[in-house]
């Protein structure tokens, strides 16, 4: 058998140098590592990796070329109680592979065994890694670097956003190419979006349970190869990387940033009954948080938790993030269940991965957004992330819904959330933009469903409606489901307008869920993670042009208000904000806590948001000055109105003087 040259211990992964390929793999507890390469006929050829530098195994294969398919067999102890689950009968994915050939199907051969090892060889059906070469012309691409204070985030799914768009060519709908199509870019520009936040695009697998039910993982929060693009979103798997970069380059030319939702908290190997794809067989003890009995700490709800305090795993995660920035020019990340990033195992702001990101000249310069919780004790960490991070602000989400849909939130609590939740985020030198304000997200009801359903309707997910949260703070306005009388439709529309206005004219960084701006419904499903169908795909033919125009007008209005774009905390007397009652007087302490839900918010001394969240039409006395309603609450040409606004029940209006 041909022997490999020793090669180099860095960088991790498979790298072509023009003459051959250098292979490197981390494993602190392996006793032997075999590189397995497959020829055009599928014949397997095995080579021991001869180099062993610290915990890095490496070797160099002369004359190997891009397109070569490979995997690893890793030898070591099978000692489940100690956290070791080596099984050389199983072909393993390189954690740093840039492309994968094959599908991650539910098959007993892709399991290592629970208590006893399964020594049946699986190379015939296991997915293979592919060696790639990177040559791409970025031309004059430059990151937009939109200031945080001017950032408007649009959360979208690659397929769901584009698959049904009638003006995008059929052959590219649902793909990376569609994201860069002029029709999509023009839509985002007209809406006023500055950052497109994509649900996971790194390669993921559908859980075996879903496959057995005929479903699939649609959202993508089940990663299997963090350096590889999910091939189902590409017109051709071989060109996925260039298709993705073409889209990013086109978006950048339009001034739109691209933020990736990335999953560093767990892997698709799930619990001990889950499949064996990669990390579990390479070095289970190092990659995962292991309990004393050898099982996993399940702090993610997905069966396992990556140990992001282990030095090698920190290096792996950091290299992954740098890859997406340096190779694909992404502008930032949203981190799923990001409290795991700070676990040591207790949560710490100076956890190793946070420190590595802070000290990295590449990663410290991009937008970083945390979903600031996990499901373990002490996992709720909203407001506690390091200064470089912004965070999803669930306080804002719940407050906005309670104020407009449940009518049970005092004015003081509403104002606190409107002012970027300063009680939560104004610390450690952080700015208002650290609060990522949202009313909806991929996880939960859509905006339309918030006003049409009191209860979740997740039966299609196959769990007898047990999955998904029951704490929705929604209001169906008297009838469960879509449709209804003209009066019902109008009341729901008014609530949608109120929630959108609160989101887009409050301090902090707004995030809009794709489809909310044109009335997309998931028919009451608030956990549509496994619905790759018309329930989740945006139906552009049914889009409400009126609601889209309303949303766009709000976004463009936001950009005109200095108090919202200057990204500095509001202080009493600084001219940024004044809080007034229905008589244009400062609110008393009692009004803040117990007063009627009527409020006037004067921003930058020129823009006035008048709110009447009561059940009755109410006269609102505006502050001194000549006020006129402005779009989207009135047409462009409006006469100066009187000093009093007749506020409709559960209504609001924006004025300018």
UniProtKB/Swiss-Prot annotation:
The active site is at 336 (nucleophile), 371 (proton donor). GO terms for molecular function: glycogen debranching enzyme activity; hydrolase activity, hydrolyzing O-glycosyl compounds. It holds the Pfam family GlgX_C. Residues 458-479 are annotated as: Disordered. It is an enzyme of class 3 (hydrolase). The keyword RNA-binding does not apply. The record marks 443 as: Transition state stabilizer. The gene is glgX. One of its GO terms (biological process) is glycogen catabolic process. It catalyses: Hydrolysis of (1->6)-alpha-D-glucosidic linkages to branches with degrees of polymerization of three or four glucose residues in limit dextrin. This is Glycogen debranching enzyme. HAMAP family: GlgX. Removes maltotriose and maltotetraose chains that are attached by 1,6-alpha-linkage to the limit dextrin main chain, generating a debranched limit dextrin. Belongs to the glycosyl hydrolase 13 family. The keyword rRNA processing does not apply. Residues 458-467 have a biased composition (Basic and acidic residues). Keywords: Carbohydrate metabolism, Glycogen metabolism, Glycosidase, Hydrolase. Pathway: Glycan degradation; glycogen degradation. NCBIfam families: glgX_debranch, PRK03705.1. InterPro entries: GlgX_C, GlgX_Isoamylase_N_E_set, Glyco_hydro_13_cat_dom, Glyco_hydro_13_N, Glyco_hydro_b, Glycogen_debranch_bac, Glycogen_debranch_GlgX, Glycoside_hydrolase_SF.
């Amino acid at each position: 058998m041909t022997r490999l040259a020793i090669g180099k211990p860095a960088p991790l992964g498979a790298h072509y140098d023009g003459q051959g390929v250098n292979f490197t793999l981390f494993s602190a507890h392996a006793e032997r590592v075999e590189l397995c390469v497959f020829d055009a006929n599928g014949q397997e050829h095995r080579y021991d990796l001869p180099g062993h530098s610290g915990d890095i195994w490496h070797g160099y294969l002369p004359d190997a070329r891009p397109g070569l398919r490979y995997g690893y067999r890793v030898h070591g102890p099978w000692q489940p109680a100690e956290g070791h689950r080596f099984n050389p009968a199983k072909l393993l994915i390189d954690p740093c592979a840039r492309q994968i050939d094959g599908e991650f199907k539910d098959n007993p051969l892709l399991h290592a065994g629970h208590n006893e090892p399964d020594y049946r060889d699986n190379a015939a059906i296991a997915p293979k890694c592919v060696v790639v070469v990177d040559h791409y012309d970025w031309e004059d691409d430059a990151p937009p670097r939109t200031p945080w204070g001017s950032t408007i985030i649009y959360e979208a799914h690659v397929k769901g956003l584009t698959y049904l768009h009638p003006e995008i060519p059929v052959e590219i709908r649902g793909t990376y190419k569609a994201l860069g199509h002029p029709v999509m870019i023009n839509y985002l520009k007209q809406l006023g979006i500055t950052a497109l936040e994509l649900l996971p695009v790194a390669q993921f697998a559908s859980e075996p349970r879903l496959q057995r039910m005929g479903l699939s993982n649609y959202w993508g929060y089940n990663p299997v190869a963090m350096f590889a693009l999910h091939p189902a979103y590409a017109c051709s798997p071989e060109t996925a990387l260039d298709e993705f970069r073409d889209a990013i380059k086109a978006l950048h030319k339009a001034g739109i940033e691209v933020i990736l939702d990335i999953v560093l908290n767990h892997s698709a190997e799930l619990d001990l009954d889950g499949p064996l794809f990669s990390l579990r067989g390479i070095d289970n003890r190092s990659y995962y948080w292991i309990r004393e009995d050898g099982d996993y700490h399940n702090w993610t709800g997905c069966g396992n938790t990556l140990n992001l305090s282990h030095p090698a795993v920190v290096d792996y995660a950091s290299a992954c993030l740098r890859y997406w920035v340096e190779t694909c020019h992404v502008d930032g990340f949203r981190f799923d269940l990001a409290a795991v990033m700070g676990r040591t195992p207790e949560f710490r702001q100076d956890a190793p991965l946070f420190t590595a990101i802070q000290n990295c000249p590449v990663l410290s310069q991009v937008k970083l957004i945390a979903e600031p919780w996990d499901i373990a004790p002490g996992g709720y960490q909203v407001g506690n992330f390091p200064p470089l991070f912004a965070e999803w602000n669930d306080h804002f989400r719940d407050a906005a819904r309670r104020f407009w849909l449940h009518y049970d939130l005092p004015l003081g609590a509403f104002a606190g959330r409107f002012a970027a939740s300063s009680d939560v985020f104004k610390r450690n030198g952080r700015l208002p933009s650290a609060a990522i304000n949202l009313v909806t997200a991929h996880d939960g009801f859509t905006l339309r469903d918030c006003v049409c359903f009191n209860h979740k309707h997740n039966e299609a997910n196959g769990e007898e409606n047990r999955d998904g949260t029951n704490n929705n703070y929604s209001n169906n306005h008297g009838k469960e489901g879509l449709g209804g009388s003209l009066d019902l439709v109008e009341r729901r529309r008014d609530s949608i307008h109120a929630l959108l206005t609160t989101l887009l004219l409050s301090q902090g960084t707004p995030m809009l869920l794709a489809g909310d701006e044109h009335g997309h419904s998931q028919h009451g499903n608030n956990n549509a993670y496994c619905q790759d169908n018309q329930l989740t795909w945006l139906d552009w033919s049914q889009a409400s042009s009126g609601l889209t125009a309303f949303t766009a007008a709000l976004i463009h209005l936001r950009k005109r208000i200095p108090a919202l774009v200057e990204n500095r905390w509001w202080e009493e007397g600084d001219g940024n904000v004044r809080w007034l009652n229905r008589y244009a007087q400062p609110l008393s302490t009692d009004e803040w806590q117990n007063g009627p839900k009527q409020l006037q918010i004067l921003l930058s001394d020129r823009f006035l948001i008048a709110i009447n969240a009561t059940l009755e039409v109410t006269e609102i006395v505006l502050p001194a000055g000549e006020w006129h309603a402005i779009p989207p609450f009135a047409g462009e040409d409006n006469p100066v109105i009187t000093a009093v606004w007749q506020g409709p029940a559960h209504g609001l209006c924006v004025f300018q003087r």
